[in-house]
Amino acid sequence: MNKLTCVVSCPIDVISGYGARSRDFVKALIKVKGEEWDIKILSQRWGECPYGALDNNVPEDLDLLRRVIGPMERQPDIWFQITVANEFQPVGKVSIGVSALVETNILPAELLEGLNRMTFNIVSSNFVKDTAANTSFDKLDQNTKQKQGTVELTKPIEVLFEGVDTNKYKRLENSDFDLSEIKEEFCFITVGHWLAGDVGEDRKQLTTLIKAFLSAFKDKKKRPALILKTSLAGFSIIEEETILDKIDVIRKSVGGDMPNIYLLYGELTEEEMNHLYNHDKVKAFALVGNEGFGRPYLEFSAASSKPIIASPFSGHVDFLNQEFNIFVAGRVEQLHPSAVNQFLIKESSWFKADPKSIEDSLKAVYENYPKYIDNAKRQGHQSRTQFSYDKMVERLAEILNKNVPKISAPQTITLPKLKTL
């Protein structure tokens, strides 16, 4: 049986959020369409993020590496492009864009135009889908500046959540992650990149969380610690020192006798992260910013069934149940100039957590921890059963069956040999 040709352009071997999404997506695609499509991978860079996510010694990873091809010689039947949407190009007979888009309430026009170039698109959360669907811009003539029309979403868009691998993120009786240097028995943990923006203005609100944690527990005899798993762009001694300096600036702004913050720096395997989340000293997860999806929330919940403090805005609310988690107060505000970039445009808004609400939430979980355990277990069960990788595979099958038009695979015809006259 001849198969349709399928090429997936993505950062398959890159250590980054888009890299992780690419690997999960392609593995799911192989499960769903591997018998019908000849699936190949066009490996791409992702900014300055390092390579090396794939391991030759892992059979699934080796299969992905063997599917990597050089420059294409002909048009594929099916084309997937996992990247920022302004880079989308309709290369295949059917072209499908996969993107996280943005974490704000307005999509830049160039991303909308990219979505409209594809046959259909796949995003990670309902928040992102709604942002795309609700954004429109006036299209102006470059010379007269007169309105010529409207730029808005014209192509279908589907939601495929980033399912957690429950074979990797799961409950453990004992954790062998070494936290012996941490003296505190109660630690909050936060996981996320330290992104651009002044203190209190970064997308993930790490600086707001750090400052609120220090303020909540300063000058107290009994207090928890905060484990901060973060990085800027890569992993280096210089970058680590830069992060420590940033933390020190916040500490000096608070003053007093402050609780400890432990920087956990460097790349960890998923097995190591699972052991970290299951450690007895790690009691709760806190992250109060804006997410396209929010993989760390889901992975922590599935692994540990421990309490989560979060913002009530953006991608992670798809899977964080309002009844089972602690949501901080705040308001949706226009972006600060220090956080603006090509895709996070100045006209857009996102969630700004209220520092006092963060402090109150941290104190409540620390001082009344047993109160939050049952709901955390319910959230963990929901994460493992409703938002697993296997459920993601099922959802991908539904999306493809619904949206990919029928294409006939090329047939090989064997002609009979003719007699020579």
Task: Briefly describe each language-model feature range.
Residues 7-9, 48-133:
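Extended catalytic core of nucleotide-activated donor transferases of GT-like folds
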Residues 275-292, 303-306:
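Acidic donor-binding loop of glycosyltransferase active sites
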Residues 368, 389-421:
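C-terminal alpha-helical cap of glycosyltransferases
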Residues 349-357, 367-398:
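A charged, aromatic-enriched C-terminal amphipathic alpha-helix characteristic of glycosyltransferases
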Residues 21-23, 28, 166-275:
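Conserved catalytic-core segment of nucleotide-activated headgroup transferases in glycan assembly
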Residues 120-171:
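Donor nucleotide-sugar binding/catalytic pocket of nucleotide-sugar-dependent glycosyltransferases
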Residues 1-76, 225, 394-399, 419-421:
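N-terminal pre-catalytic "stem/leader" segment of glycosyltransferase-like enzymes
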